[in-house]
Amino acid sequence: MSQPKRRKLESGGGGEGGEGTEEEDGGELEVAVPRPRRTRRERDQLYYQCYSDVSVHEEMIADRVRTDAYRLGILRNWAALRGKTVLDVGAGTGILSIFCAQAGARRVYAVEASDIWQQAREVVRLNGLEDRVHVLPGPVETVELPEQVDAIVSEWMGCGLLHESMLSSVLHARTKWLKEGGLLLPASAELFVAPISDQMLELRLSFWSQMKQLYGVDMSCLESFATRCLMGHSEIVVQGLSGEDVLARPQCFARLELARAGLEQELEAGVGGRFRFSCYGSAPMHGFAIWFQVTFPGGDSEKPVVLSTSPFHPVTHWKQALLYLNEPVQVEQDTDVSGEITLLPSQDHHRHLRVLLRYKVGDQEEKTKDFAMED
């Protein structure tokens, strides 16, 4: 005999200490109990566990834009790496460490906090590099190296650059282990923003207005409901766009130099900047997209290598981070869009991204929206 269906409701308001609500269905009651807030250590352990599975590493290495950029960025710096020591922060399966060894590094310390370090050690052994690539299990904040290093390599970027990123770990390693004037790969990051018209979202919003023609049932009243469901939230949406979705010339609103002193404090306070756009033409504006690029120094007389996640470039596994308005706003050619954007750590989870957006479209009043990246 099947159990009666029960529906659990979230505690009112979503805040701490809110009273749980209950609902009767089939004669049973169930009270929603707010989950206890995890400690920073517990959140870190859950974060590391995510990287113990092969799927996440498959997705990253299968991203040819990402992996080729790292390989080229490392190999172009062969003159600076030859005979030197390198620290790979968050080494994963060890592929970047092996690239460094192929570039001539004398010793590579591959530090990995998740259990995938065991597979990394096997990969290193399979490639006959165990004498030069040393896999060290544990967070870089606690691992001890036998020496200072000449270079640090890390693929630390997350969605929107800073969500679940390891940048704080890289900066810790830089301060503790990198020799003065040492090499950082990549060396800098830039954040971009642009207003967008999301063609996929527009199709979903207009879907309900097509039902009368398709099935003889007028369901157009659901379009406003769909708008509230799909846009009236505060979640950062990770989705790939094309250049055709971009409504104005993108602008860089923040630049991070990884060697810069005080960068840790800047990140805690929030990085961002103001923007002003003039729209290309007539379209429904659904919100803003943010993306990033990182740059590897070019080495001796070589061009720098740029890894871009722009919608005007081939798609990467990072895609773009979308910030939807509460409803579409019609813009025309030369419509002015202005405001300010700030990226900072979530108050609830130090690894999660929060985005504060203040914006004004045309003659409309200025509005604000506070976004977060969900688990």
From Swiss-Prot:
GO terms for molecular function: chromatin binding; histone arginine N-methyltransferase activity; histone binding; histone H2AR3 methyltransferase activity; histone H3R2 methyltransferase activity; histone H4R3 methyltransferase activity; histone methyltransferase activity; protein-arginine N-methyltransferase activity. GO terms for biological process: cellular senescence; chromatin remodeling; DNA repair; methylation; negative regulation of DNA-templated transcription; negative regulation of transcription by RNA polymerase II; negative regulation of ubiquitin-dependent protein catabolic process; protein modification process. It catalyses: L-arginyl-[protein] + 2 S-adenosyl-L-methionine = N(omega),N(omega)-dimethyl-L-arginyl-[protein] + 2 S-adenosyl-L-homocysteine + 2 H(+). S-adenosyl-L-methionine binds at H57, R66, G90, E112, E141. Its EC number is 2.1.1.319. It is found in: Nucleus. Its main location: nucleus. This is Protein arginine N-methyltransferase 6. It comes from Bos taurus (Bovine). The lineage of its organism: Eukaryota, Metazoa, Chordata, Craniata, Vertebrata.
